[in-house]
Swiss-Prot record:
Protein's recorded name: Coilin
Primary location recorded for the protein, binned into one broad class: nucleus
Stretch list, region Disordered: 119-256, 282-325, 339-392
MF annotations from Gene Ontology: disulfide oxidoreductase activity
Basic and acidic residues compositional bias, start-end: 144-159
Highest rank taxon of the organism: Eukaryota
Region annotation (Required for interaction with SMN) ranges: 389-417
Domain Tudor: 457-556
Similarity field: Belongs to the coilin family.
Record's subunit section: Interacts with ANKS1B. Interacts with SMN1 (via Tudor domain). Interacts (via C-terminus) with AK6. Interacts with WRAP53/TCAB1. Interacts with HMBOX1. Interacts with PSME3; the interaction is inhibited by PSME3IP1. Interacts wit UBL5.
UniProt repeat feature Sequence, residue ranges: 390-391, 394-395, 405-406, 407-408, 410-411, 412-413, 414-415, 416
PTM annotation, UniProt: Symmetrical dimethylation of arginine residues within the RG repeat region enhances affinity for SMN, and thus localization of SMN complexes to CBs. Phosphorylated by VRK1. Phosphorylation during mitosis is associated with disassembly of CBs.
GO (cellular component) term, any one: Cajal body
Gene that this polypeptide is encoded by: Coil
Length: 570
């Protein structure tokens, strides 16, 4: 057996170790026969001072690191070692060996490198796809721009010639103005094919009902006609804020066809609103009374139809413009109040009752023809809201029954409409009357406990000086622990003597009186666990029917006579 080579080491920690958090400097006695390499010494320090098995410790002797694979003989007696807790992510290739040359690369570094490679690949693929899409768009724009240039009117060609002449003869300031105008016209031409492609996509996605009203051929208008239409719309629409918002929401980048269609819709909606306002005073009170008596809903104004068609025809309008239109329509609805019930279906005529929740006749309605101003067939005299919240989605029901199918009132996006305020009056007169007739009563019920049987008066029984014969019944008291584990004299208990030893004065008694209900074991009760998983509880307060006590431990023993049934009870 080799002699033990023990060395005394002074360990200095940067921070207190977990096992002894109050100190950072320690002395350690190490047997070098058990520690072959520095790793063994590190594991010993890790075990002694409560570090986890995954903690990376570094040993430094006079400022130099002791390599983990080096021999532990580097350490001599009374050396001072600095123990430093290394970071987990610093060593990329951590060499952990026990005498051999096996190396284990860090898993986290591998995962990070793998993630970086994946991110680079996805970025490259995304960039190449983006470039491909841009090339296709540029080629399509160039083709459409060339087609548009061939379709220019002769007056525009004359204008361009005059511009060229003025460029040759004009001053430098005029040349700058002409250049800026040319740039703006080029931008418009570039934007037009984009808007056309987007409009065609939106028309393909719409249902056949909407396609009938929106797939009409848009006439190409010259810039002069567009300017005239804009002037007419601005002069004719000063009174109504909703129509002004429509004319303002048509940006210059929108194509000429779209703007001309909007002007036609504006004039049609003006005529419709004028007709409605003529008939409104006669039917306002009747519509308001029907609204209060029957559960239904009203729409804010018929002018929202124009804004709905304009928003569905041009997807290029931003969400902020949509919200601006919606707020204007809501203000109009609040000021105008309840309109005529036949506002949306002006072509049918007749004013019927409001739409109740039980009517199953609403199977759908078609949007109006925006160019010709005629109404599609629909349920007569039915007030329908221009939009419900964010639009009726695919197959969503209106008013809990079979409702309007399809994609609903379309706004920007798929299945989204304008959030126009709708008034739902769901409380009927019968419900109000039922609530008024409800009567609340306060009643108190007295719950009486059952009458307890009267206790026997054992004081009339004869006292016993010695134990009676076997088989006799006695009444006695015992010194027991109460429920709060304090010693106290119990009440009278009835028992039957089973055996009696005259020498030791031990008595076996069978308790005849009822025992208290078993409770969960307390802190003074002993619980024994068996091998089969069962538990045996030894209560501090005795819970057994048969007890063995000394006769002198019985307090106030009395003999129960057979005629004790006639004992008076208190």
């Amino acid at each position: 057996m080799a002699a033990s080579e023990t060395v005394r080491l002074r360990l200095q920690f940067d921070y207190p170790p977990p096992a002894t958090p109050h100190c950072t400097v320690f002395w350690l006695l190490v047997d070098l026969n058990r520690c072959r390499v520095v790793t063994d010494l590190i594991s010993l320090i890790r075990q002694r001072f409560g570090f986890s098995s995954g903690a990376l410790l570094g040993l430094y002797l006079e400022g130099g690191l002791l390599p983990p694979a080096e021999s532990a003989r580097l350490v001599r007696d009374n050396d001072s070692l600095r123990v430093k807790l290394e970071d987990q992510g610093l060593p990329e290739n951590l060499i952990v060996s026990n005498g051999g040359d096996s190396s284990f690369p860090c898993r986290k570094a591998k995962k990070r490198a793998f993630k970086l490679m994946e991110d680079e690949e996805t970025d490259q693929g995304y960039k190449s796809l983006k470039k491909h899409c841009k090339r296709q768009e540029d080629s399509g724009q160039n083709e459409k721009a060339s087609d548009l240039e061939t379709k220019l009117l002769p007056d525009e060609t004359g204008r361009t010639k005059s511009k060229k002449k003025s460029k040759v003869t004009g001053s430098p300031a005029e040349e700058d103005e002409e250049e800026t105008k040319k740039k703006s016209s080029k931008r418009k031409e570039k934007c037009e094919p984009k808007k056309q492609t987007r409009a065609s996509k939106s028309s393909k996605q719409q249902t056949p009902k909407e396609g009938a009203s929106q797939n009409c051929s848009f006439p190409r208008a010259s810039p002069r006609s567009l300017g005239k239409a804009r002037r007419r719309s601005s002069t004719g629409l000063k009174g109504s804020s909703g129509h002004l918002s429509e004319s303002e929401s048509c940006p210059e980048s929108v194509s000429d066809g779209h703007c001309s269609v909007m002007m036609q819709e504006v004039t049609f909606s003006e005529k419709l609103s004028a007709e409605l306002l003529k008939d409104a005073p006669a039917t306002k009170t009747a519509a308001a009374n029907r609204q209060a008596s029957k559960p239904g809903f009203t729409f804010s104004s018929g002018k929202g139809k124009a804004s709905r068609t304009s928003s569905s025809s041009s997807d290029s309008s931003s969400e902020s413009e949509d919200q601006f239109l919606v707020s204007k329509n809501m203000l109009e609805g609040a000021s105008a109040g309840f309109l005529k019930p036949t506002g949306l279906f002006a072509g049918q005529g007749g004013s019927g009752p409001g739409l109740s929740l039980e009517t199953p006749g609403i199977m759908g309605w078609k949007s109006s023809d925006s160019n010709r101003g005629r109404q599609a067939p629909g349920p007569p005299s039915t007030p329908v809201p221009t939009s419900l919240g964010r639009g009726w989605g695919r197959g969503e029901d209106l008013l809990f029954g079979k409702g309007l199918r399809g994609r609903g009132v379309r706004g920007r996006g798929r299945g989204r409409g304008q959030a126009v305020s709708c008034v739902f009056n769901r409380s009927s007169e019968s419900q109000k009357q039922r609530q008024l007739n409800d009567i609340l009563t306060n009643s108190s019920v007295v719950i009486q406990n059952p009458v307890e049987p009267p206790k026997k008066d054992y004081s009339l029984l004869p006292l016993l000086a010695a134990a009676p014969q076997v088989g006799e019944k006695i009444a006695f008291k015992l010194l027991e622990l109460t429920s709060d584990y304090s010693p106290d004299v119990s009440d009278y208990k009835e028992g039957k003597i089973l055996s009696h030893d005259p020498e030791t004065q031990q008595v076996d008694i069978e308790v005849l009186s009822s025992l208290p209900a078993l409770k969960e074991p307390g802190k003074f009760d002993l619980v024994y666990h068996n091998e089969n998983g069962t538990e045996v509880v030894e209560y501090a307060v005795t819970q057994e029917k048969r007890i063995t006590v000394l006769w002198r431990e019985l307090i106030d023993p009395r003999l129960i006579i057979d005629s004790s049934g006639s004992i008076s009870s208190t």
